Swiss-Prot record:
Comp. bias regions, Polar residues: 181-191
Pfam families, sorted: SAM_1
Protein name: Sterile alpha motif domain-containing protein 15
Gene that this polypeptide is encoded by: Samd15
Source organism (scientific name): Mus musculus (Mouse)
Sequence ranges assigned to domain SAM in this UniProt record: 480-543
Ranges of Acidic residues composition bias in the record: 261-270, 609-620
Length: 620
């Protein structure tokens, strides 16, 4: 062995330790043969080393076998490196052997996937557990599933949801649906901690009890519903029967009410006649007693007819008739038996009208209104000479019917009759009135005459309406388009100037600018044509201008202004020039201002002053 000089500096690669670093050891397990050769090729083969130094042991560049690298890992015991390769997914098995991978042994510490899988199962079971407010049927169902099966949770999931739903619905029908708030509040924390124990205890305690309670509770509402249905059916039948009986008795009641009103009106007429014509007491008493007895008998009949349907009806139907029936019953009860006990007719006259005042006030009040509205022919006095005595008797019931409709209280009519029946009643009245008073035909003939007289006026109005649109507006030219203006110019006799108007877009509103000063700008330079076109436009627009003796006229100026222009020059002529001489020389007498009124005023002033002076002299 050759000695190494003292000046020799060993490289960092030479002092490599045999123990591999942890960072590089991970690569050795999965390394290929090519990579191992590259690592060994970095060492210098020519250097001599001491056999005594462990750090100077040479690493031979020869290729090593795959089996030789395994005991290095066993001697040095690097469990962390093997743990990194094993940590794959959760539910995966041990790593499979490949041609390039080294064989490794699994330590007991590599059971971490089983721990994680157990944790995941627990979390899945906690999530799949029912909430705190689950029904008892669901708790019982899941309990039975857990007791039957020993496999994990994922396998024991029900594959037929329809069966599960049917079971849950059948069990839910047999058990009460709601819990008390106290039980739910106490059971929630227990379910989160020990769900299995809670489910077993609750099912054992509450299976027998709630079934009996629920059957009793379910029978109660069924019995109540059957009772309600049995009660409602006879009520409906009774209501229908009462309605039919009321409809049958309604026309009879109306007839009785009309009879009452007839009697009351006859009494009022007789009383008015008696007040006008006094009669002896002997004649008055029996007639009054007869009328009172008639009243009492009729009212007693009304009482019987009105009370019988009221007994049959239910309280619900009685409320629909409202107040008018109650008023009639009260009046009949008060006045039904009293007239027979009282003998004196004077006392009867005072006592009987008191309860019937409310019912008789309304029919008696509208009499003056009816007398105003009805024609003179409706009155009995006017109908006597025109018609025989037989028709006068028929006139009274028609009038009474009208008074009953107008004067009777609206509440009673609405409660006793429908709209359809009232309409039929009104139609009957109209037919009766037409039979009694055929003068209505005369009014129809008058309306026909009026229509015939109106016809010529309508014809005149139609003729006026037709003539108005034919009139042309005064300023129709304002709506003309440039093409229409060009046609108008060609009609005047200047078709060569059409393009001048169309190119300059001169419509009807711009015709006011068509004059001798603007026509040359449009391209019309002939002086005679300019004069003719400007003249026709003035006529069309209604502009009046004086005819000038020459075509181009000087601008209008004031006479005084023109005079001062001449007077402003220096010289003998300008100095001696006066306004009157200038006006005469220029021929501007027509443009002189009117001074006649001012001259008269100036002349009147001295006259007034002379008169005032004379008055002053006389006063002095």
């Amino acid at each position: 062995m050759s000695e190494v000089s003292g000046d020799y500096n060993s490289d960092s690669d030479e002092s490599l330790s045999l123990q591999p670093k942890r960072t590089k050891s991970g690569k050795l397990h999965n390394a290929n043969a090519d990579t191992l050769f590259e690592v060994s090729s970095k060492l210098s083969p020519n250097t001599d080393r001491d056999p005594g130094n462990v750090g100077n042991v040479p690493l031979e560049p020869t290729r090593t076998r795959k089996g030789d690298l395994v005991p290095v890992g066993k001697n040095h015991e690097v469990p962390d490196l093997q743990r990194q390769d094993v940590s794959v997914g959760v539910f995966k098995g041990p790593p499979t052997r490949t041609g390039t991978q080294l064989p490794t042994k699994i330590d007991p510490e590599q059971k971490t996937p089983d721990i994680r899988s157990e944790k995941l199962r627990k979390s899945v079971e906690e999530e799949a557990l029912p909430p705190s407010k689950m029904t008892k049927s669901e708790k019982k169902q899941k309990e039975s599933i857990k007791e039957k099966s020993t496999e994990p949770y994922e396998v024991t999931k029900p594959k037929f949801p329809d069966r599960k739903l049917r079971k849950s619905t059948e069990e839910a029908d047999l058990k009460p649906h709601f819990k008390s708030t106290e039980q739910s509040g106490t059971e929630q924390p227990e379910q989160t901690k020990f769900p299995d124990k809670k489910l077993r205890q609750s099912t054992k305690k509450k299976v027998s009890g709630p079934l009996e309670d629920f059957e009793e509770e379910s029978r109660r509402p069924i019995d109540e519903a059957s009772l309600e249905l049995s009660q409602k059916r006879p009520l409906k039948a009774s209501k229908k029967a009462q309605k039919s009986s009321f409809d049958e008795k309604f026309p009879e009641m109306l007839e009785q009410i009309t009879v009452e009103l007839l009697d009351d009106q006859e009494e009022t007429q007789e009383e008015s006649i008696k007040e006008k014509v006094p009669e002896p007491l002997g004649d008055r008493k029996p007639s009054a007693q007869k009328h009172k007895l008639r009243k009492s008998s009729e009212r007693s009949k009304l009482k019987d007819t009105l009370i019988e349907p009221s007994k049959d009806k239910d309280p619900g139907l009685q409320t629909q008739t409202e107040f008018p029936k109650e008023k009639l019953i009260k009046t009949t009860e008060k006045t039904g038996d009293k007239p027979q006990q009282i003998t004196d007719p004077d006392i009867q006259e005072k006592s009987q009208p008191e309860p019937t005042e409310k019912n008789l006030e309304l029919p008696n009040k509208p009499k003056p209104e009816e007398e105003r509205d009805l024609p003179k022919e409706d009155k009995p006095e006017s109908s006597k000479p025109n018609y025989p005595a037989g028709k006068d008797k028929l006139a009274l019931p028609a009038k009474i019917k009208t008074e009953f409709i107008v004067g009777s209280p609206r509440e009673s009519v609405e409660s006793f009759s429908t709209l359809y029946e009232t309409q039929e009643f009104l139609k009957d009245l109209q037919t009766d009135m037409n039979e009694l008073f055929p003068i209505v035909d005369a009014s129809e003939s008058q309306t026909e005459l009026r229509d015939s007289t109106v016809l010529p006026q309508e014809v005149e109005l139609l003729g006026r309406k037709e003539t108005k649109p034919s009139l042309t507006p005064e300023f129709e030219h304002l709506t003309w388009s440039p093409e229409r203006v060009a046609e108008w110019i060609s009609d005047l006799g200047f078709p060569q100037y059409k393009e001048c108007f169309t190119e300059n877009f001169i419509n009807g509103q711009k015709l006011i600018h068509v004059n001798c000063s603007n026509l040359p700008q449009m391209g019309i330079t002939d002086f005679e044509d300019m004069k003719a076109i400007s003249y026709h436009t003035r006529v069309l627009l209604g502009i009046e201008e004086p005819l000038f003796s020459r075509s181009i006229s000087l601008p209008y100026r004031d006479n005084k202004g023109l005079f001062f222009e001449q007077k402003g020059h220096s010289g003998v002529k300008s100095d001696s020039l006066t306004l009157a001489k200038f006006v005469e020389a220029a021929g501007l007498q027509e443009y002189n201002p009117e001074i006649k009124a001012e001259e008269k005023k100036e002349d009147a002033l001295p006259e007034n002053s002379l008169e005032e002076n004379e008055e002053l002299y006389e006063a002095t």
